[in-house]
Structures are given as structure tokens and as C-alpha cells.
Swiss-Prot record:
Disulfide bonds: none annotated. SMART domains: BACK (SM00875), BTB (SM00225), Kelch (SM00612). The gene is klhl12. One of its GO terms (molecular function) is ubiquitin-like ligase-substrate adaptor activity. It comes from Danio rerio (Zebrafish). Component of the BCR(KLHL12) E3 ubiquitin ligase complex. Residues 29-96 form the BTB domain. Coiled coil: none annotated. This is Kelch-like protein 12. The lineage of its organism: Eukaryota, Metazoa, Chordata, Craniata, Vertebrata.
Length: 564
């Protein structure tokens, strides 16, 4: 029989446990580390094996080589105790309270495992309120992966980050670095302009001189004419600065003289790159007069369509949302019954992904509205085959569970659901007797629905999306005609206006925002199913047909996914 090496995972662990017991009983210890007057007995060989810092100290010709006591400066006794526990046990508890001391100490003593654990912990704690501070902390301690992760987080969540105290405390050069970045993800330049203005006003006396320089990096020509005239022109800080007025005039000229745009090209006239976003169109009612399971993906950069794996169950009247790199296909109608089942696609750019089932809703729902708020999915209304619902339920993907929430005032199917400023809006729909123009708003903090100003037109099967802090409602059916009209709701003024009509009437149409523009996807025009996609540019208040899918459909689920 040939000899064979046998390895056991428990051997190294048992040695560490024995060494730790010896340390705690001060047995065979040959070095004492003194920190803030507290002595920590230890074994040179263990310290040297875990730390390049101690290895150099005990094996080179440093003064500490022959000493039995070593003073360690630059960390606290409590931190030293945590680090020694790691050396002897290979475990460390990183907390919000200790990480700011633990990471610098781990860097000082060159304990790579603790440094990595601290970086992983801080990465998991990234939030709009702390990402800028974590980025600076990571840069100070040469944690390059964490620094990059924090930068990407601040770019992805720019609109939220600039509302935090950390942003207000940045230096002028740090603000400039952030707003000039091509990769910040914003639907328009409005939050960029407002971020600069708010930063200046936070300390106007000292910061006002920086305003013209910072506005150089705001892409004002890409703002809507209405925003330029109503907001920017009315701002006193802009009106009293000639360099700022010059930038505003450039933006106005860009709109008033479109024939000169080719001569005005500069970084200010180029859209930010942001993340690579793709549009998914899922299921629906197809040309065979039945529900379909086809999933198509549109890349706006290449203007090309491709197919993804089909959903497991054919569905029309389906609701779809994207959340944390996953796509959820919710409820619908399979041709026989309304569904409570939910399918999920875990999607990455280099893989097609696989559909799998998650927890079913508490209620069967077709033509329900769906949206996301925070890390939760909300679904409201819909038709179960016998009645329309007022109910709303929420899905928590962390525990794979649905829970019921407060009922709407009106039962609705075919209504749109969208989040704006932390509130959930439900718009239009059909109550079983009438097509509706009413709008309700849900406050997650109070759990109550309240009515707001209704739409000008009754609409069911309309597309709903949020663009530049305004809710757009496109197309739908009013009981008589299939609509091409578009209404816009200002959440600040509780007021509705109209913008340019779509090129084609569309009912059971999907709507979403992609790279700062509003897309209306497929639908039914009153005569035939559509495969065309049109796009609305709010800067010039105009729609254009940009592409067509391979599949004619209505009642489809649509969402935008950011590719990694």
C-alpha cells in the first residue's frame, strides 16, 4: 500500500487553542508587549508568524530584538487585546464602536487578516450618510479596494449623498472632484446643480467665491428650459455673478439655437456615463392571443436587442421590479387564473442568469402596481379573478416573506405604482365600474393613504415612471379611446401639467426611465399589439421612436437593471 499524507483541519486549530491557553496563563511567554501601561505576555514565534511588523522586530538587528519588554505606541490597550486575541484565535469581532481604532492598529502591526476584516465590515456599512468619510478613511490607511467601493457607492447614490452632512463639510476641491466625475448616476443635472448651490449656502461667506468654478462642472445645457428659467434664473447667487450668468447664457443658447449645438460641444454638453443600464421586457400578451414567457433585453448604448432565458410560467398582466441586481416578476395571469407566484432572476452582465421562485404573495393579483422603496418591494391593487383589491403588501427579500400593509381608499386594477420622495403613489386604474383619474399617496411612516390632486384624464393601463422628481403618466385607456397623451405631476406643488403626446396611442404600456429619458414600451393602440419603443427627451419636450422588439406585446413587465 502506497504511503499517503493525511491532513486534518483540527490540528492547526488545536495548536492555536493550546498556545492561547499558554498565553493566558503566562506560560512559556518570552515577550511582554506594554500598551498604555498594560502588560500583554505573548510568544515571539506566534507574533512573528502572524505579523511582518513583529517578524522584523524579532529577527532583525532592531533594539527590541533582545528585550523582554516592548513598548507599543499608537494604539490603546483595549485594541491590543482584540489584536492579540486574533493572533491566537484567528477570529475578530469588528463593530461600529471599534473599527476606527482597529483598522489603523492593524495597519500599524501589519495584521492583514484584521485589516481585511475591518475593510469588509466598513464595506457592508456603506450608506449615503457615511460613504464619503469611509472613502477618506480608506485612503488614509491605503485600503484601495475599500476606497474604490466607497467611491462607486457615492457615484451610484449621488442624489442621496449630497443631502448628507458629510457632503456639506467637504472642501471645494473634494466637491469639484465629485461633481466633475462622469460616472455619477443621476437622471438629470438638477441634483448636481442643487448640490453645488446647497454646499455654497452652507457657508456662504467663505464659499460664494467658489460658485463660478464649481458651476463649470454642472452640465447646464442638459437641463430643461423650464428649470433654467424658473429655478436657475431666479437664484440670487446666480443673478449677482457675471461668470455664473455666462454659464446660464450658454445653456440658454444651447436650447434657443439648436443649429449651433455642433459648435458648442464641450464636457458640459455631454451626458454623464453613469452605470451601464439595460431595459428588460418580460412576458405579456403576445400575437398568438395568449400570455407569453419571452424576455428581451435592450442595450441603449448599442441599440441592440437580445433574448434572456424565458420565465418559468407564461404571464400577462404582470408586475415587474428590479432590486439589488435582481429582477422580480410578480403575479399576473397565465390564461387560466390570476397568480400569486413570484419569479426572480439573479442577473449579472456576464451571465444570462437563472429564474427561480421566491415566496408567493398573500393575494392573487393581475394588473397590480409594483415599486421598490429601500430594500423592499411593494405591490398594491390588482384583480384576483373575482374582485379588485384595495390591499397592499410588502416583500422583504432578506427573509423571503410578504406582509400585508394598509389598504388604499379605492380598489384598483391597471393602476400605476411609483415612489417619489419616500412616498408611494398609486395612480388611475379601474375599480370594476369606472376608469379612474384619482391618485392616492401612501406614507410608510404612518401607514396611511391620502388623496392628492387627480389627473386631468381617466386612465387605466397607463405607464408610470419618475423622472427628475416628477411623476409621468403615459397613455392608457379612458373608457372610450386609447391614449397617446402624457401628464406630469409635480410632487412639490401637487399640480398636474401636460407635455408632448407620444407618437402612438398605447394602452397596457410599460414605462421606465433609462439614462435620463422616459421610455414607453410596446402596448396596444386599439387595433394591434405593438413592438415599438419610443423615448421622451424632457429637455426638448419631444418623443421619438428609437427601436422595436422582436415580439409584439402588451401587458408586459418592464424594468431597468444596472449591469455590473
Amino acid at each position: 500500500m502506497a504511503p499517503k499524507d493525511i491532513m486534518t483541519n483540527s490540528h492547526a486549530k488545536s495548536i492555536l487553542n493550546a498556545m492561547n491557553a499558554l498565553r493566558k496563563s503566562n506560560t512559556l511567554c518570552d515577550i511582554t508587549l506594554r500598551v498604555e501601561g498594560t502588560d500583554f505576555p505573548a510568544h515571539r514565534i506566534v507574533l512573528a508568524a502572524c505579523s511582518d511588523y513583529f517578524c522584523a522586530m524579532f529577527t532583525s538587528e532592531l533594539a527590541e530584538k533582545g528585550k523582554s519588554f516592548v513598548d507599543i505606541q499608537g494604539l490603546t490597550a483595549s485594541t491590543m487585546e482584540i489584536l492579540l486575541d486574533f493572533v491566537y484565535t484567528e477570529t475578530v469581532l469588528v463593530t461600529v464602536e471599534n473599527v476606527q481604532e482597529l483598522l489603523p492598529a492593524a495597519c500599524l502591526l501589519q495584521l492583514k487578516g484584521v485589516k481585511r476584516a475591518c475593510c469588509d465590515f466598513l464595506n457592508s456599512q456603506l450608506d449615503p450618510s457615511n460613504c464619503l468619510g469611509i472613502r477618506d478613511f480608506a485612503e488614509t490607511h491605503n485600503c484601495l479596494d475599500l476606497m474604490q467601493a466607497a467611491e462607486l457607492f457615492s457615484q451610484k447614490h449621488f442624489a442621496e449623498v449630497v443631502q448628507q452632512e458629510e457632503f456639506m463639510l467637504l472642501s471645494q476641491s473634494e466637491v469639484e472632484k465629485l461633481i466633475k466625475c462622469d460616472e455619477i448616476q443621476v437622471d438629470s443635472e438638477e441634483p448636481v446643480f442643487e448640490a453645488v448651490l446647497n454646499w455654497v449656502k452652507h457657508n456662504r461667506k467663505e464659499r460664494e467665491p467658489y460658485l463660478p468654478d464649481l458651476l463649470e462642472y454642472v452640465r447646464m445645457p442638459l437641463l430643461t428650459p423650464r428649470y433654467i428659467t424658473d429655478v436657475i434664473d431666479a437664484e440670487p447667487l446666480i443673478r449677482c455673478s457675471l461668470p455664473c450668468r455666462d454659464l446660464v447664457d450658454e445653456a440658454k443658447k444651447f436650447h434657443l439655437r439648436p443649429e449651433l449645438r455642433s459648435e458648442m460641444q464641450s464636457p458640459r454638453t455631454q451626458a454623464r456615463l453613469g452605470a451601464k443600464e439595460v431595459l428588460l421586457v418580460i412576458g405579456g400578451f403576445g400575437s398568438q392571443q395568449s400570455p407569453i414567457d419571452i424576455v428581451e433585453k435592450y442595450d441603449p448604448k448599442t441599440r441592440e436587442w437580445s433574448f434572456l432565458p424565458n420565465i418559468a410560467r407564461k404571464r400577462r398582466y404582470v408586475a415587474t421590479v428590479a432590486l439589488n441586481d435582481r429582477v422580480y416578476v410578480i403575479g399576473g395571469y397565465d390564461g387560466r387564473s390570476r397568480l400569486s407566484s413570484v419569479e426572480c432572476l439573479d442577473y449579472t452582465a456576464d451571465e444570462d442568469g437563472v429564474w427561480y421562485s421566491v415566496a408567493t404573495m398573500n393575494v392573487r393579483r393581475g394588473l397590480a402596481g409594483a415599486t421598490t422603496l429601500g430594500d423592499m418591494i411593494y405591490v398594491a391593487g390588482g384583480f384576483d379573478g373575482s374582485r379588485r383589491h384595495t390591499s397592499m403588501e410588502r416583500y422583504d427579500p432578506n427573509i423571503d416573506q410578504w406582509s400585508m400593509l394598509g389598504d388604499m381608499q379605492t380598489a384598483r386594477e391597471g393602476a400605476g405604482l411609483v415612489v417619489a420622495s419616500g412616498l408611494i403613489y398609486c395612480l388611475g386604474g379601474y375599480d370594476g365600474l369606472n376608469i379612474l383619474n384619482s391618485v392616492e399617496r401612501y406614507d410608510p411612516h404612518t401607514g396611511h393613504w391620502t388623496s392628492v390632486t387627480p389627473m386631468a384624464n381617466k386612465r387605466s393601463g397607463a405607464g408610470v415612471a419618475l423622472l427628475n422628481d416628477h411623476i409621468y403618466v403615459v397613455g392608457g385607456f379612458d373608457g372610450t379611446a386609447h391614449l397617446s397623451s402624457v401628464e406630469v405631476y409635480n410632487i412639490r406643488t401637487d399640480y398636474w401639467t401636460t407635455v408632448a403626446n407620444m407618437t402612438t396611442p398605447r394602452c397596457y404600456v410599460g414605462a421606465t426611465v433609462l439614462r435620463g429619458r422616459l421610455y414607453a414600451i410596446a402596448g396596444y393602440d386599439g387595433n394591434s399589439l405593438l413592438s415599438s419603443i419610443e423615448c421622451y427627451d424632457p429637455v426638448i419636450d419631444s418623443w421619438e421612436v428609437v427601436t422595436s422588439m422582436a415580439t409584439q406585446r402588451c401587458d408586459a413587465g418592464v424594468c431597468v437593471l444596472r449591469e455590473k
